[in-house]
Amino acid sequence: MCGIVGAIAQRDVAEILLEGLRRLEYRGYDSAGLAVVDAEGHMTRLRRLGKVQMLAQAAEEHPLHGGTGIAHTRWATHGEPSEANAHPHVSEHIVVVHNGIIENHEPLREALKARGYTFVSETDTEVIAHLVNWELKQGGTLRDAILRAIPQLRGAYGTVIMDTRHPDTLLAARSGSPLVIGLGMGENFIASDQLALLPVTRRFIFLEEGDIAEITRRSVNIFDNTGAEVKRQDIESNLQYDAGDKGIYRHYMQKEIYEQPNAIKNTLTGRISHGQVDLSELGPNADDLLSKVEHIQILACGTSYNSGMVSRYWFESLAGIPCDVEIASEFRYRKSAVRRNSLMITLSQSGETADTLAGLRLSKELGYLGSLAICNVPGSSLVRESDLALMTNAGTEIGVASTKAFTTQLTVLLMLVAKLSRLKGLDASIEHDIVHGLQALPSRIEQMLSQDKRIELLAEDFSDKHHALFLGRGDQYPIALEGALKLKEISYIHAEAYAAGELKHGPLALIDADMPVIVVAPNNELLEKLKSNIEEVRARGGQLYVFSDQDAGFVSSDNMHIIEMPHVEEVIAPIFYTVPLQLLAYHVALIKGTDVDQPRNLAKSVTVE
């Protein structure tokens, strides 16, 4: 969602800030801005509605000079997208950027108005600027003012603040929204995502909940919310920003779809040894914890929730462990009963998804056996706060609609299933079949990608459609859910997914010649049941698009289009059948002319509730 970049150096920092914002564009935003202060305290602020490139053009026309600055990309929450609502916000000499939501901004706004402050935006962020300004007038340093202001704010936020009268210092505060400090030589940086700072440093300090940081060119001091100084470890990051060039591809999403064979190879690297899954990276005590697991609770949002839904079938059928999957935003707001020896698994590409993080923190109070995060970003909040963590190693994913992060999550989950089956003393053939399937998966997906042109032609049938229905059975039902999500995310076609057996319980009423029905139908034990559901659609004139392998015995007809897939091992079929649905959504979006990589109203990493 929103992105923050800050810098304090002996050189001009405007280009550092702009490059940082460019690297955060993938998170989604509607406006951008920056403010730079020189050594004499002269501040220049630029804000633009639209892309970072428009802000960069403005900076070329009006050069910004100064060694201290903060910048921001905004994803509108309070107040419409506009230049007036774009960050940074100013209250006299106080300049603020902010990620998150201040839940009590309205009473604070009224109180500040009563003190004589005038608001020029609709945002909750301007409340922070005026509140810090007010507290500073009551005496003390900027840090003192922030320490007094922070307890008055309710909600999740990450904020960076500068005082133009003291351009040698930046202050930052974290409560529920990530901030990371980048350490340089005679210069220091801060951002909401380490990707923004990779061009200038590889050394980072991740702020923890309640931290307040005071940053100068030569020092970083961190305090807790009482003002007591605390120590935070700095780490050397090996994260690679490898997505800057789309190469031969038109969009990042297309590139990331085609990267999946290699991404899955990376996920598997070092984790299969002598025909067994090797997850020794979990540490020496992991086996003891995992061997006690009698139940699994999975929390996730969006695409990650769909991967959790697939894994439920695997955990129960292959490892014999009961598994529940819940949307994180629902879990955290209801009373739940914790089963005996239940393992909490959280799934998140970014590791910063607000609701998933909140669910993890709640689980620590509820008595879960332990927690395991599956994530694509080392050092993220979810990873740091979990007992165990497994990285998907998918590489940077820029497209808002997740592709390779989803398939690599499933790959990690399936490896975990194999490990648990062994720890439970189940038949060794279970792990053997999983390992064999996973090793074959990259080449199977490469085979499937050769069908791209066929899927591109079929996508033309969707050019005038407003609705679509996806069907699947068993562990392919969550893949139907994921296919529907991809189509609605990037083509803006209303799409729903149902377990095929539910057709006659309502969705069948929607079927007519204008309703395309996409079916995921590998040749498995549920195929005959699924064929009956397909006939129900055919009998009512629905247009069918069936993804299946040749052994399934389907034949194309006027209203049934068969997209023949290579045969794959049953255990990896859910991962495999995801890819053609990604391609279908991509090509439909191209025909519709939408913004594939940054679809409207959506953000890559949802760091607010």
Swiss-Prot record:
GO terms for cellular component: cytosol. Its main location: cytoplasm. It comes from Salmonella typhi. The keyword Cytoplasm applies. This is Glutamine--fructose-6-phosphate aminotransferase [isomerizing]. NCBIfam families: glmS, PRK00331.1. Residues 2-218 form the Glutamine amidotransferase type-2 domain. PROSITE patterns: GATASE_TYPE_2, SIS. The keyword Metal-binding does not apply. InterPro entries: GATase_2_dom, GFAT, GFAT_N, GlmS/AgaS_SIS, GlmS/FrlB_SIS, Ntn_hydrolases_N, SIS_dom, SIS_dom_sf. The active site is at 2 (nucleophile), 604 (for fru-6p isomerization activity). It catalyses: D-fructose 6-phosphate + L-glutamine = D-glucosamine 6-phosphate + L-glutamate.
